[in-house]
């Protein structure tokens, strides 16, 4: 292929191009005339082989043209660029193939009867073109994966806002579900805490979200549940009012703000907010739905803040005021006892050496085994004797415990009581007569 850079002015390009084409036409005409004036013995052939000879002569002319074009050089270096597809050029550009078809379809026949590029060469070039397309596609896909996600790309795949559901009604249902789960599972608030305990054997039903797409009904159920939760927090707060009024005042302000925020939902209970298959009908319904979504997101934060503040205040008052002195002393004694037991076990784990007296007794009376065993388990046996209730159940401790001397049986009467009964004094007043005294009538 002849490639030259176009560096001449625009005014001379057309003239130079016409001049080059004229030279090429003259040269081609001379070559064709030279082939026609050859020896007729070389050009004549039999009738049965006319098609093959015509194709051979044509292919010979084309091959000669191709060789001449390879040796052709223009006179002007500044001539415009010319490209000949299918020739042995330095840079081959992608072209349309007529002798290769995809998916096994038959190839089209050329009109000229001969081709500038052979069949295997065309197949090879087209395979290279297909491979180049695939490599370019994979490279572009890698570049797309490296690009950051933008809002426009999210809108193209149907995600709006901060990756929420596009349908406003479905977003509201997800918020209702999360609030019900938060109140029931995380905060432990359900119908079991709000129902009276008159029916002990009637198990409470788990408070779940209603199975309905009616937004107004869902909001009414949630408001009732949140109001009960607010009453429970108020009851817990009022029980600790006399302990610390400053902390009580802080929690009280928070609960009052929570109650005033909950009043905003009562205004949304007035409109019907109808929807058909999850789609709001009018613009007013869409506005109320968006406002309810914002309020529900804020309601979740109010619930968490109120529960956390009241729970911490109640826990602190329990530690400071509700635990009596006896409970505190018992807790301290248990800790001290556990520390002593752990220290005794650590000392028991340490290896002890045998003294000279113990060694003499073991050798003289052949008691080496028992003495060594006692030395190894000395600390453990000491802890066992000092605190048997730690290692044995109460029934075993009662059996093995020391018998109290001078125990008095309450069933047998004592001698002092018998003496008191014998020396009992006679009352000074006469006994009372229960008989009836007759009266005389006058």
Swiss-Prot record:
PTM section of the record: Ubiquitinated (C-terminal region).
Acidic residues: compositionally biased ranges: 416-425
Residue ranges of coiled coil: none
Keywords carried by this UniProt record: Cell cycle, Cytoplasm, Developmental protein, Differentiation, Oogenesis, Spermatogenesis, Ubl conjugation, Ubl conjugation pathway
Outcome reported for the amino acid change (mutating residue 394 to R): In strain: Zim10
GO term, biological process aspect, one: negative regulation of peptidoglycan recognition protein signaling pathway
GO cellular component: cytoplasm; fusome; spectrosome
Principal localisation: cytoplasm
Disruption phenotype: Viable, but males and females are sterile. Flies exhibit abnormal cysts containing an excess number of cells undergoing transit amplification, which do not differentiate into gametes. Conditional RNAi-mediated knockdown in intestinal cells reduces adult lifespan due to severe age-dependent dysfunction of the intestinal barrier.
GO terms of molecular function: mRNA 3'-UTR binding; mRNA regulatory element binding translation repressor activity; ubiquitin binding
Main function: Regulatory component of a deubiquitinase complex consisting of bam and otu. The complex deubiquitinates K63-linked polyubiquitinated proteins, antagonizing the ubiquitination activity of Traf6 and regulating the IMD immune signaling pathway. Otu-bam deubiquitinase activity is regulated by Traf6 dependent immune signaling regulation of bam expression levels; this forms a feedback loop that regulates the IMD immune signaling pathway and balances gut immune activity during aging. The complex deubiquitinates and stabilizes CycA/cyclin-A to regulate CycA-dependent differentiation.
Self-association state and partner proteins as the record states: Interacts (via central region) with ubiquitin. Interacts (via C-terminus) with otu (via OTU domain); the interaction enhances otu aggregation into amyloid-like structures and enhances its deubiquitinase activity. Together with otu interacts with CycA/cyclin-A (via C-terminus); the interaction stabilizes CycA by promoting and enhancing otu dependent deubiquitination of CycA. Together with otu interacts with Traf6. Part of a complex composed of at least tut, bam and bgcn; complex formation does not require RNA.
Domain notes: May possess a C-terminal PEST sequence (rich in Pro, Glu, Ser and Thr) targeting it for degradation and rapid protein turnover.
Full protein name: Protein bag of marbles
Organism: Drosophila melanogaster (Fruit fly)
UniProt lineage: Eukaryota, Metazoa, Ecdysozoa, Arthropoda, Hexapoda
């Amino acid at each position: 292929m002849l490639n030259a850079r176009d560096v001449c002015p625009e005014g001379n390009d057309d003239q130079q191009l016409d001049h080059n084409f004229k030279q090429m036409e003259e040269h081609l005409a001379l070559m064709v005339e030279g082939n026609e004036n050859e020896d007729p013995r070389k050009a004549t052939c039999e009738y049965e082989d006319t098609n093959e000879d015509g194709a051979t002569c044509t292919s010979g002319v084309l091959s000669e043209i191709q060789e001449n074009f390879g040796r052709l050089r223009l006179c002007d270096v500044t001539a415009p660029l010319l490209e000949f597809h299918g020739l042995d050029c330095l840079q081959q550009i992608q072209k349309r193939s007529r002798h290769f078809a995809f998916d096994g379809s038959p190839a089209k026949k050329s009109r000229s009867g001969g081709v500038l590029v052979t069949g295997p060469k065309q197949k090879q070039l087209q395979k290279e073109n297909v491979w180049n397309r695939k490599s370019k596609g994979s490279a572009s896909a890698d570049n797309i994966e490296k690009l950051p996600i933008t809002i426009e790309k999210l809108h193209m795949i149907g995600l709006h806002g901060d990756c929420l559901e596009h349908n406003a009604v479905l977003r509201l249902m997800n918020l209702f579900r999360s609030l019900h789960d938060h109140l029931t599972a995380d905060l432990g608030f359900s119908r079991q805490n709000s129902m009276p305990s008159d029916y002990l054997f009637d198990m409470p039903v788990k408070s779940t979200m209603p199975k309905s797409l009616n937004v107004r009904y869902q909001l009414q159920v949630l408001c009732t549940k949140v109001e009960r939760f607010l009453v429970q927090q108020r009851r817990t707060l009022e029980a600790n009012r006399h302990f610390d009024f400053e902390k009580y005042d802080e929690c009280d302000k928070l609960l009052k703000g929570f109650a005033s925020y909950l009043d905003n939902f009562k205004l949304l209970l007035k409109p019907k907010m109808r929807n058909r298959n999850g789609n709001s009908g009018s613009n007013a319904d869409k506005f109320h739905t968006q406002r309810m979504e914002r309020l529900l997101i804020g309601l979740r934060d109010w619930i968490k803040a109120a529960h956390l503040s009241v729970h911490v205040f109640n826990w602190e008052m329990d530690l400071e005021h509700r635990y009596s002195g006896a409970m505190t002393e018992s807790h301290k004694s248990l800790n001290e006892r556990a520390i002593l037991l752990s220290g005794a076990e650590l000392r028991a784990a340490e290896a002890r050496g045998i003294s000279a007296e113990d060694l003499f007794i073991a050798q003289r009376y052949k008691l080496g085994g028992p003495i060594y065993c006692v030395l190894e388990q000395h600390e453990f046996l000491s802890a066992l004797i000092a605190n048997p209730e730690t290692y044995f159940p109460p029934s075993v401790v009662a059996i093995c415990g020391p018998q109290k001397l001078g125990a008095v049986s309450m069933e047998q009467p004592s001698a002092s009581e018998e003496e008191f009964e014998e020396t009992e004094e006679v009352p000074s007043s006469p006994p009372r007569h229960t008989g009836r005294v007759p009266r005389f009538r006058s």
